[in-house]
A protein has these predicted regions:
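Helical hinge/lid and interdomain linker segments adjacent to catalytic or ligand-binding clefts
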Residues: 12, 16-98
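Catalytic grooves of carbohydrate-active enzymes
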Residues: 226-255, 264, 329-333, 344-358, ...
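A glycine-centered loop/beta-turn motif at secondary-structure junctions
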Residues: 4-7, 26-29, 56-57, 120, ...
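Active-site beta->alpha N-cap acidic-glycine motif
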Residues: 206-299, 354
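C-terminal domain-boundary segment and adjacent tail
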Residues: 34-36, 218-220, 224-235, 262-279, ...
Length: 613
């Protein structure tokens, strides 16, 4: 996929530093090539800028250790005229060991040195400025910061330097700049102090959860500021609330569909019911009518099949395992029966459903994800996107996304309880991740409007967020970036995507989807018409042109032997029937009083549900 954008990274050592690693991870996240130049002699400075085989440079990063080998006037000014005159520059990894005159020379006196904070709490905060053009959804926020050493920048001209990030400690008014933007002859130049959690930077950068996100926040902000639409970016901000287990009866325990609809209209959010297929023929007409009349507020996805405990557990168990084994062929049979039942549900109610699997109790092993792919599911969404028994993906960029294709080339997404911290929501919005919440009916025990506060927080944090069904979110689960020719590259996650051209001109999308071609592809269609595609290594490639202000649907259909009409959808298993009755009794009667709700809260929070109903 040729996009023609790259980051010029100038270093002075062959050993990768923490700051260099963070830039490389950030570039990988945004789909930018890194053109590395080793500066060990001032005479070689300019040859990297004019090499004919280099792509268009959209950002320049210089490690502070390389400054002695870089003539700042030559690199930042004279050497970057023409195509590179306005390219933003980041000087990163600044520590007290960097000579002050090198910093002062490179910054024209804006940054004159660095020091280490003395007596700074290990739980200090990293305050982010309100400069939304740089900080986006993180504007004005405070990130947890647990660095082993906290270096900061000495700013010489405080009036004309924009402090983007600074350390602060509780109980004091002191501020320590760590990420600064200055303007040098019309060019944006950023300076960042070294940021790391541990001496082992490889381990430190393997996961950027919120306690470590401050490490990479600066490079990510810089790269997106410098490269703009040439970075991989999502096509919108999406959010969803999923409620697990209910069938369509009014009320279902503490969940009143009529009441919830009023709250959704008031607070502006969308609810997906993770529907147990066993309940396919139990829906009440009143609730069915409510769903059919309000598709912008209600939707249905698939929640297992029978929901008999950990329904998609290990294929083989060992002594001490909590649940019985569920061999792969049994799990595939459950997937087939779930689809057969959902097709019956669709015929009986006239309500469509999304082929998005929410596994009961926990995500299945990886090979089951291949089964979902074979039966043309869009994605799976669970509290954790790593399959049972699988290790975390080694790629650092995977830890910045809530979706991974690492397992069977099938999209697996994270979701969170409503207790997810606001800063975590903001980080996901900044990264372009969908905001997916889930709850059970007892969440509404005290108030049917219990979710409104969370919805308000998300809507206020990102006014352009769209609350959609899990299916709609999956169909918009792709990244795009601007090409040199004005068209777009697309990195697809799901096998069903909606391309929306919001421009006033025709746009061609060059689509790549990581693909193992197992299971085999039956066909690819664009707006229901067969479309040719290419195979290149482990990728499916196709090109789609979309007229101005129009959209087109791309669908990849995989081969399988499913004939929904021939699937046995009967409820002949007495054990499952008893279990479902007991579960309904728990949800619809026990949980509707204070004592029952207290038990229900303990039931889920303690993990007792993994042992019982």
């Amino acid at each position: 996929m040729g996009h023609g954008s790259s980051v010029l990274l100038i270093t002075s050592s062959t050993e990768r530093s923490p700051s260099e690693e963070q830039v490389i991870v950030g570039a990988g996240f945004y789909g930018l090539d890194v053109q590395h130049f080793l500066a060990q002699d001032k005479k070689d400075n300019l040859q990297c800028l004019y090499a004919p085989n280099w792509k268009v440079i959209t950002a320049i990063v210089i490690t502070a250790e390389a400054l002695p080998f870089v003539e700042s006037k030559e690199v930042l000014l004279d050497g970057l005229k023409g195509n590179y005159r306005d390219v933003p520059v980041l000087i990163t990894g600044v520590t007290p060991e960097i000579e002050a005159n090198n910093l002062s020379d490179a910054s024209k006196g804006y940054v004159v040195g660095s020091k280490t904070i003395v007596d700074c709490s290990s739980d200090a905060l990293c305050k982010i400025s309100d400069e939304r053009a740089i900080t986006k959804q993180l504007a004005g926020q405070e990130l947890p910061c647990k660095a082993i050493r906290k270096h900061y920048l000495i700013v010489g001209d405080k009036k004309n330097a924009d402090v983007v990030m600074e350390f602060k400690t509780e109980g004091t008014d002191e501020r320590f700049p760590v990420f600064v933007k200055v303007n040098i002859d019309g060019r944006a130049v950023f300076f960042q102090a070294e940021m790391k959690v541990s001496e082992n930077y490889a381990r430190s950068t393997s996961r950027y959860h919120r306690n470590r996100f401050f490490e990479i926040a600066g490079p990510l902000m810089f790269l997106r500021y410098a490269c703009g639409e040439r970075c991989w970016h999502s096509v919108g901000h999406y959010a969803n609330l999923t409620i697990d287990d209910p069938w369509l009866t009014e009320p279902y325990g503490n969940l009143s569909y009529k009441g919830l609809l009023k709250e959704m209209e008031k607070a502006n959010f969308h609810t997906t019911i993770a529907f147990i297929p066993w309940n396919y023929n139990r829906s009440q007409a009143e609730v069915v009518s409510l769903f059919r009349s309000n598709p912008e507020r209600f939707s249905i996805s698939i929640h297992g099949n029978n929901h008999d405990h950990y329904e998609f557990y290990k294929y083989r168990t060992e002594p001490g395992d909590r649940w019985p084994a569920k061999p792969l062929n049994v799990q595939e049979a459950n997937v087939r029966q779930a689809l057969g039942r959902m097709e019956q549900f669709k015929r009986l109610t006239g309500i469509d459903y999304d082929r998005v699997m929410v596994f009961p109790h926990g995500i299945a092993p990886a090979k089951t994800l291949r089964v979902l792919k074979e039966y043309n599911f869009l994605a799976t969404v669970n509290a954790g996107n790593t399959p049972l028994l699988a290790g975390k993906p080694p790629d650092s960029t995977d830890h910045l996304r809530q979706v991974t294709l690492e397992f069977e080339n099938f999209p697996s997404l994270n979701r969170w309880t409503p207790g997810k911290a606001r800063i975590d929501v903001l980080i996901d919005l900044f990264l372009g991740n969908p905001i997916l919440f889930y709850a059970h009916q007892e969440f509404f025990g005290s108030d049917i409007g219990a979710f409104n506060e969370i919805a308000d927080m998300v809507n206020e944090s990102e006014p352009e967020v769209q609350w959609k069904s899990l299916g709609d979110i999956a169909r918009h689960l792709y990244l795009k970036r601007l090409r040199e020719d004005g068209n777009y590259d697309v990195l697809a996650f799901a096998g069903d995507l909606i391309l929306e051209n919001k421009h006033s001109r025709e746009v061609t999308y060059f689509i790549e989807k990581p693909e193992s071609f197992s299971p085999s592809i039956r066909y690819v269609t664009v707006d229901d018409e067969l479309s040719p595609y290419d195979r290149a290594e482990n990728k499916l490639i196709l090109r789609v042109t979309v007229s101005a202000k129009q959209s087109r649907r791309v669908l990849i259909e995989y081969k399988n032997q499913l004939f929904a009409d021939s699937v046995d959808v009967s409820k002949s298993n007495m054990r499952v029937g008893v279990l479902r009755w007991l579960s309904d009794f728990r949800d619809m009667h026990v949980s509707t009083n204070r004592l029952g709700r207290a038990f229900g809260s303990f039931y889920y929070q303690s993990g007792l549900f993994k042992r019982g109903l």
